[in-house]
């Protein structure tokens, strides 16, 4: 079969080694004669899978002992509700930074539960889209927490700064598309959440990292499956969890450790992004409209100077084994999502194609 590189924004490419191992174990997991999908989530076999996955995840991010790790349903959008329902307490407002599509979606959901104070961080620098530095974010005095999205998959915008607002500010963040791609100081956050389908594993699983002093504050109307305390007290098994997604995510964690961990992956991700942005920046045929300081290393949107060639580009790239390059309907153009599982060979194949396409159509 010809080599295919999947640039989908999510569900996204999984490491080939992980897929191969899952395929080998699919019908007979560890000699049980059954699939891991078929065993009880409360049996000792799956409990071992769950415990190993959590420990490997903790190791990869150096998660402090006073933080709990929850394996949840609901995706990032579920946490758009889960965060206010768990953290508002007796307060009626929270600070929300608007820097892109997903941040705005979180704000829209939060309005059901509180009156968010919106910090519009979107700016333009030399004609390109950018984000205000954190020192310019005007936080309110009465906010229960601060929420932001470090990586906007649709806009291709990243906020790489580490928050430093003092211990009185509970920082929450949607790391769905950038978790495990670069070192992360978990201690600077109150809550970190991430849908699994981009940098962790298959869709259906959501990870939440929550500082333990923030437990026990859920609103009485909070659904039990979103209540961090309920989930923690039941080892993330208040109801049947997405066991296969949990198992596969655990395999990805072991794969990441074998690659050298998050620091090693960060170096590779930088190389991939530099390679792709380099081709875009050295061409009049392609363009990216995000300021360099806020460019995402995970999601690279780009446009053709002649958008009548978009359809041809997508058809020819697909035929060349470069799949899922169509940009989001909100922004159009192209988008290459180059998460951890995308090898540098895939990015090299894309850039070679882009150079050749420009030669033939420019």
UniProtKB/Swiss-Prot annotation:
At what positions is N6-(pyridoxal phosphate)lysine found?
198
| Family annotation (CDD domains) | PSAT_like
Q: Quote the catalytic activity from the record.
A: O-phospho-L-serine + 2-oxoglutarate = 3-phosphooxypyruvate + L-glutamate; 4-(phosphooxy)-L-threonine + 2-oxoglutarate = (R)-3-hydroxy-2-oxo-4-phosphooxybutanoate + L-glutamate
Name of one Pfam family that matches? Aminotran_5
One cellular component term from this protein's GO annotations in UniProt: cytoplasm
User: Which cofactor(s) does the record list?
Assistant: pyridoxal 5'-phosphate
Subcellular location field: Cytoplasm
Binding positions (L-glutamate): 9, 42
According to its UniProt record, the EC number is: 2.6.1.52
Listed pathway(s)? Amino-acid biosynthesis; L-serine biosynthesis; L-serine from 3-phospho-D-glycerate: step 2/3; Cofactor biosynthesis; pyridoxine 5'-phosphate biosynthesis; pyridoxine 5'-phosphate from D-erythrose 4-phosphate: step 3/5
Task: State how the cofactor is bound.
Answer: Binds 1 pyridoxal phosphate per subunit.
Coiled-coil annotated residue ranges, if any: none
Q: Assembly state and interactors? A: Homodimer.
Family assignment from sequence similarity: Belongs to the class-V pyridoxal-phosphate-dependent aminotransferase family. SerC subfamily.
HAMAP family in UniProt = SerC_aminotrans_5
Q: What role does this protein play? A: Catalyzes the reversible conversion of 3-phosphohydroxypyruvate to phosphoserine and of 3-hydroxy-2-oxo-4-phosphonooxybutanoate to phosphohydroxythreonine.
Q: Kindly provide the name given to this protein in its UniProt entry.
A: Phosphoserine aminotransferase
Organism the protein comes from? Salmonella paratyphi C (strain RKS4594)
Q: What is the lineage of its organism?
A: Bacteria, Pseudomonadati, Pseudomonadota, Gammaproteobacteria, Enterobacterales
Q: Which gene produces this protein?
A: serC
